[in-house]
């Protein structure tokens, strides 16, 4: 492997060293920073394209602003790797997303240079405004800078924050990182000149003087002058939308040209006016040809060869659950023209890119707008369509009020395909699908399913298509299936009914979802000790199979309920039923194994499951504490009636 020399970057311990560098050295620093980012991510995998697109911007921000005293907030955090390298974390950059290593996102507990944690989209302006107001209340003078991408600007939260900031006239700097040129491209030297001019003190001072003088003029003259300035600046800069929200707009400027960036950032740093938006245009994957040529493939990457760009992907033993979902939904849609699909800016992540290729008129990408996605689906359901709202579990949280108010309360048959349920590995706690079971099983009238394998997922999709009695959800994990044979066509499952997959006498395991394989492993281990175990596949978290659970409780000495979800989910439903029916009064030993009441950091999925006690070893240990081999015969003899 070729090692790129980085003599200037080697002198940078933290951002204070970046500020001490002369401006003529910053281009070299950016080049070396880009090379180091590529080298590090080739080893660890992670988000590459976004970080390469903000290298010059990152250098410029840390050179101009006094971080960490000045608060620099990165929206989402996909682009934060260069920032981490410049802020004292270069020595650990090759531990990104590894167990015990650096987070793939900004994180308050990791560095004082990360004033606000991120991973979900469109939060930076709200957080920045809160910090700006706190500064003003405290009589401080620090700058607050929020860097947000144009994609994140599709979320309503960003505009809610901008509307609030404009109304408060708080001194806040928003950097709009436009890396899709979806708003407006820069127009070369004239664009840079205008941006520098209108962000400068002279123009701003004259503007303030003009406002004061206009205050003494008749209202129609004052309003006319304001509209004339707005028109002139909007004509040249395209920032009328942001001006209407109360922001002073500067740009667009070339985000890869330090000669353009530095003077503008200095001007806005020194401005004492209200909120300012600087529109910076960048290119995803800048400086790395494979990423420039295919931005979507290099947004998130596994380990790759730096020279060729080839990503090292392990051969799959089975299709991913996401692909099974997509292919099955396509089959169902061929039979039912009322089936439609909705995604919130995650078509490839949810598999709906495949559905969209087959049914472009029945596929809807609503942008980063989960609240809207859910209620949009509710509207479709109200008109007799069968909408599948495909969301990651972690992003379902963003639309929860709509799930309750617009779907559940009205009993509308929206189908929720909940991907990335449970632990997700390298993306860590911010993306873990821990809470969907607790969120949904508490809602009256909701049906919630979880497949043990890809065959069951196929059946659950068919079940959801045919379920018009109310809202229904099915959750499935990240990654590959277990390799079972998939049916050619899904069959509708009886609602609220599980199945017994192994018969025993002493201890019963009731598994929801893909922990079933681990429970079967544990049952086999216990068998070698003379302990007979029943293993049941719950299939439904709501409604629970009351008949099956009562049978397990009455015919076994111990019952272990297993789910890859937080406290308050399926296990809580089972315990409530056992309590209501008095099924624990005769001495039944019950344990509900869930994710622990904490946040599990990024690591391999296997390590995360072990930490949670939900791998086969953890389940086995808990089971042995309930039924020892010597107790087996006595337990069978005292079965409860």
From Swiss-Prot:
Catalytic reaction(s) noted: D-glyceraldehyde 3-phosphate + pyruvate + H(+) = 1-deoxy-D-xylulose 5-phosphate + CO2
Required co-factors: Mg(2+); thiamine diphosphate
InterPro entries: Dxylulose-5-P_synthase (IPR005477), THDP-binding (IPR029061), Transketo_C/PFOR_II (IPR009014), Transketolase-like_Pyr-bd (IPR005475), Transketolase_C (IPR033248), Transketolase_CS (IPR049557)
Pathway: Metabolic intermediate biosynthesis; 1-deoxy-D-xylulose 5-phosphate biosynthesis; 1-deoxy-D-xylulose 5-phosphate from D-glyceraldehyde 3-phosphate and pyruvate: step 1/1
Key words, A-Z: Isoprene biosynthesis, Magnesium, Metal-binding, Thiamine biosynthesis, Thiamine pyrophosphate, Transferase
Residues given in the record as thiamine diphosphate binding sites: 78, 119-121, 151-152, 179, 288, 370
EC numbers on record: 2.2.1.7
The keyword Magnesium belongs to this UniProt entry's keyword annotation: yes
GO BP terms: 1-deoxy-D-xylulose 5-phosphate biosynthetic process; glyceraldehyde-3-phosphate metabolic process; terpenoid biosynthetic process; thiamine biosynthetic process
SUPFAM superfamilies documented for this protein: Thiamin diphosphate-binding fold (THDP-binding), TK C-terminal domain-like
Quaternary data: Homodimer.
Protein name stated in the entry: 1-deoxy-D-xylulose-5-phosphate synthase
């Amino acid at each position: 492997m070729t090692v790129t020399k980085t003599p200037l970057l080697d002198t940078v311990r933290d951002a204070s060293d970046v500020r001490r560098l002369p401006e003529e050295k910053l281009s070299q620093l950016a080049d070396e920073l880009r090379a180091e980012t590529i080298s590090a991510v080739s080893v660890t995998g992670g988000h590459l394209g976004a970080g390469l697109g903000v290298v010059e911007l990152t250098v410029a921000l840390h050179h101009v602003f006094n971080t960490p005293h000045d608060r620099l907030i990165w929206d989402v955090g996909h682009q934060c790797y260069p920032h981490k390298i410049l802020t004292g974390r270069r020595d650990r950059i090759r531990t990104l997303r590894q167990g015990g290593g650096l987070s793939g996102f900004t994180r308050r507990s990791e560095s004082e240079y990360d004033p606000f944690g991120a991973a979900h989209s469109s939060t930076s302006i709200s957080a920045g405004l809160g910090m700006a107001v706190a500064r003003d209340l405290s009589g401080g003078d620090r700058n607050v800078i929020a860097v947000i991408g144009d994609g994140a600007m599709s979320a309503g939260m960003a505009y809610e924050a901008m509307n609030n900031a404009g109304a408060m006239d708080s001194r806040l700097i928003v950097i709009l990182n436009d890396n899709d040129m979806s708003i407006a491209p820069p127009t070369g030297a004239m664009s840079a000149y205008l941006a520098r001019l209108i962000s400068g003190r002279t123009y701003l001072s004259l503007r303030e003087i003009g406002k004061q003088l206009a205050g003494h003029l008749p209202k129609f003259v004052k309003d006319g002058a304001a509209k004339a300035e707005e028109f002139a600046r909007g004509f040249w800069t395209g920032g009328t939308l942001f001006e209407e929200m109360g922001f002073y707009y500067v740009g667009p400027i070339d985000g890869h040209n330090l000669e353009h960036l530095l003077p503008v950032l200095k001007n806005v740093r020194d401005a004492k006016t209200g909120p300012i938006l600087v529109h910076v245009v960048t290119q995803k994957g800048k400086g790395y040809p494979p990423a420039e040529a295919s931005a979507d493939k290099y947004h998130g990457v596994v380990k790759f060869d730096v020279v060729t760009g080839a990503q090292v992907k392990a051969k799959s033993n089975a299709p991913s659950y996401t692909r099974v979902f997509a292919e099955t939904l396509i089959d169902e849609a061929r039979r039912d023209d009322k089936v439609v699909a909705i995604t919130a800016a995650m078509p490839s992540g949810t598999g709906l890119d495949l559905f969209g290729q087959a049914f472009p008129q029945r596929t809807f990408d609503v942008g980063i707008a989960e609240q809207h996605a859910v209620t949009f689906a509710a509207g479709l359901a109200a008109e007799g369509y069968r909408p599948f709202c495909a969301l990651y579990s972690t992003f379902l949280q963003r639309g929860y009020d709509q799930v309750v108010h617009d779907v559940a309360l009205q009993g509308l048959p929206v189908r929720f395909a909940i991907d990335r349920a449970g632990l997700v590995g390298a993306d860590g706690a911010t993306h873990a699908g821990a809470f969907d079971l607790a969120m949904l099983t508490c809602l009256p009238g909701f049906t919630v399913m979880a497949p043990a394998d890809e065959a069951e997922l196929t059946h659950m999709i068919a079940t959801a298509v045919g379920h018009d009695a109310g809202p229904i959800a099915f959750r499935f994990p990240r990654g590959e299936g277990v390799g079972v044979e998939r049916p050619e066509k899904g069959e509708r499952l009886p609602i609220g009914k599980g199945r017994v997959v192994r018969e025993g006498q002493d201890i019963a395991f009731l598994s929801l979802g893909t922990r079933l394989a681990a429970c079967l492993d544990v049952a086999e281990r216990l068998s070698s000790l003379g302990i007979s175990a029943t293993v049941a596949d719950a299939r439904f978290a709501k409604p629970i199979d009351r008949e099956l659970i009562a049978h397990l409780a009455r015919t076994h000495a111990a019952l272990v309920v297993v789910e890859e979800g937080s406290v308050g989910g399926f296990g809580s439903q089972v315990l409530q039923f056992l309590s209501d029916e008095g099924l624990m009064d005769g001495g039944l030993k019950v344990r509900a194994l869930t994710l622990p009441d904490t946040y599990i950091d990024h690591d391999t999925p296997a390590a995360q499951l072990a930490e949670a006690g939900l791998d086969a070893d953890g389940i086995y240990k808990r089971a042995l504490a309930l039924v020892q081999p010597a107790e087996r015969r006595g337990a069978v003899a005292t079965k409860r009636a």
